[in-house]
Amino acid sequence: MLTLFLLTVLIYHRCFRRYDADPEPELGLPAKRLTFLSGPNRLQGYLCGTGDTLAVLAPGLGNGAFSYAPQIQWLAEAGLRVFSFDYTGCYGSTGRSCRGFPQAADDLRAALRFLEENGRFGSRRLVLLGHSMGGYAVCCALPGSRVDAAVCIGGGNSPME
């Protein structure tokens, strides 16, 4: 039993380690760097584009704010304002490790609070986009939020599954 526990701990720490890019991918369009808190950690985010709709992109495990640069660029060119961010323990954010799926949900909720506190940077509508771990975070963030639409790609049907 102890062996299984230790093996589980080892696998967990390997999967949910700190993720860094070398070098960080380029976005290809102007982006404003923003920081906000999620618990004790300072997270780094980027806001680009203009428009009445704000799309918040929650990346998958091991990815950062610019890992979806082609999609961000396409959304911005289509007239959306896009906010993407690095999770705890990933890329430009602080933290020793990404800490797993529950932390991603906490980080997305912190990002949404930050955006609401800043008037969504002038946007009236809010759309959440999540892939993999980010899709899970989107499902977790929906209850009680003021989201107009959500796209969850490979993230689970609910936070309980």
Feature-to-residue mapping (PLM):
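An N-terminal hydrophobic leader/cap segment in hydrolases
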Residues: M1-L37, L43-Y46
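Short beta-strand element of the alpha/beta-hydrolase
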Residues: D52-G60
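The serine-hydrolase catalytic nucleophile loop
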Residues: L61-W74, Y87
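Glycine-rich "HGGG/HGxG" loop immediately N-terminal to the catalytic nucleophile
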Residues: D86-F101
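Alpha/beta-hydrolase active-site loop
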Residues: C98-G119
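Alpha/beta-hydrolase fold nucleophile elbow
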Residues: R120-S132
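Glycine-rich nucleophile elbow surrounding the catalytic serine of serine-hydrolase chemistry
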Residues: G130-C140
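Hydrolase active-site cap/lid region
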Residues: C139-E161
